[in-house]
Amino acid sequence: IQRRAGGNLLTLASGATLVARAVVLAVGNTPRRIPAARLRGAVRLADAWDYDGVAAIPADADVCIIGSGLSMVDAVLSLDHGGHRGRIRVLSRHGLMPLAHAVSGGADNAPVDALLALGLRDRLRLVRAWTRAANAAGEPWQWVFDRLRPHGQALWRSLTHVEQQRFLRHLVRYWDIHRHRIAPQVAHTLAALRAGDRLEVLAGRLQSVEAGGDGGIT
């Protein structure tokens, strides 16, 4: 990228060039890695998106998945569909799993102006009141979050910087499991694996990963 008067000149790997008034780097999230300082010995690791690596895990091996978000769900389903019989342990700081979608509905917009005028604590109280009212009316709580979906940017930008940081420290994990949900069928599969003692979800912080003499890890 070369900055020029009135714009930017981008040279591609092919040698072709583009001229743009503004350049936005939208490269997505980089893959998260376990810090090398916490790895001891020849530890075998597989990225959740390394399908060949996941498929190569022995069917009877015990598996530990770091993180309990949507990527974890994909990894567990890949193992289960591949006939994995070993126990799967999931470790995350809070041990929270994505919640399930409800049947579609509740498309009317939320009265977002009422939220925009409030601070973070009062917003949380109002959203909780809405979910209680929805339950009392026979509606699933998921509809409340679906109504908020179109207003995510406005809600975020209307918070002060201090409140944004407070949200990231204390609430984002709970927001994520309510907002980024999974299909009911997937939730049923995970529940069945947990009931069958094949899937265990643990809350904790990873301190180290050490290769064992039997090929396992601790």
Regions picked out by a protein language model, each given a short descriptive name:
Residues 1-117, 127-218:
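Flavin (primarily FAD) cofactor-binding/catalytic cores of flavoenzymes
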